[in-house]
UniProtKB/Swiss-Prot annotation:
GO biological process, one term: chaperone cofactor-dependent protein refolding
Molecular function GO labels: ATP binding; metal ion binding; protein folding chaperone; protein-folding chaperone binding; unfolded protein binding
Localization annotation: Cytoplasm
Assembly with partners or alone: Heptamer of 7 subunits arranged in a ring. Interacts with the chaperonin GroEL.
Pfam families with a match to the protein in the record: Cpn10
Annotated gene: groES
Protein name: Co-chaperonin GroES
Annotated function: Together with the chaperonin GroEL, plays an essential role in assisting protein folding. The GroEL-GroES system forms a nano-cage that allows encapsulation of the non-native substrate proteins and provides a physical environment optimized to promote and accelerate protein folding. GroES binds to the apical surface of the GroEL ring, thereby capping the opening of the GroEL channel.
Taxonomic lineage from the root: Bacteria, Bacillati, Actinomycetota, Actinomycetes, Kitasatosporales
Length: 102
């Protein structure tokens, strides 16, 4: 797979992807506002850029995700990056647990 990107000038290498985390719920079902200190880290995000894949035995292995996919990822996986005032997460493809089909 060739490197694809959307809306972001970050080009991931090898089997890495750039994800924009989706915002966590701001209120409970009963209408209570959840303070920032009580919110869990989001584990869902939109794929904005995909690396070309990693090499194994001389062959490049393509990734299972594409730009625009909504993915679930490991709670503590990846590296948080702030670029041009936006927050992104750079993940290894191994940190992606599932693709959400909506």
């Amino acid at each position: 797979m060739t490197t694809a990107s959307s809306k972001v000038a970050i080009k991931p290498l090898e089997d890495r992807i750039v994800v924009q985390p989706l915002d966590a719920e701001q209120t409970t079902a009963s209408g209570l506002v959840i303070p920032d200190t009580a919110k869990e880290k989001p584990q869902e995000g939109v794929v904005l850029a995909v690396g070309p894949g990693r090499f194994e035995d001389g062959n490049r292995l393509p990734l299972d995700v594409t730009v625009g996919d909504v993915v679930l990822y490991s709670k503590y996986g990846g590296t948080e990056v702030k670029y041009n005032g936006e927050e992104y997460l750079v993940l290894s493809a191994r940190d992606v647990l599932a693709i959400v089909e909506k």
